[in-house]
From Swiss-Prot:
UniProt cross-references to Gene3D superfamilies, sorted A to Z: 2.20.150.30, Ribosomal protein L28/L24
Family: Belongs to the bacterial ribosomal protein bL28 family.
Gene Ontology biological process: translation
MF GO annotations: structural constituent of ribosome
Cross-referenced SUPFAM superfamilies: L28p-like
Keyword set, alphabetical order: Ribonucleoprotein, Ribosomal protein
Source organism: Campylobacter jejuni subsp. doylei (strain ATCC BAA-1458 / RM4099 / 269.97)
One Gene Ontology cellular component: ribosome
Keyword match Ribosomal protein: yes
Protein name stated in the entry: Large ribosomal subunit protein bL28
Amino acid sequence: MARICQITGKGPMVGNNVSHANNKTKRRFLPNLRTVRVTLEDGTTKKMRIAASTLRTLKKQNSK
């Protein structure tokens, strides 16, 4: 399975590890994915892998 949020499409980013001696090596920053059950607009529930930031946004929108 790809490490991609199924709602926003947020995926891995590329960056550097930086040591105290300022040596740089490539690394990947992975999104914080969570598997949750999401209730869709038509009333059905579906298991989705979404980013934690997306989950916070959904909770905020549903509370209004």
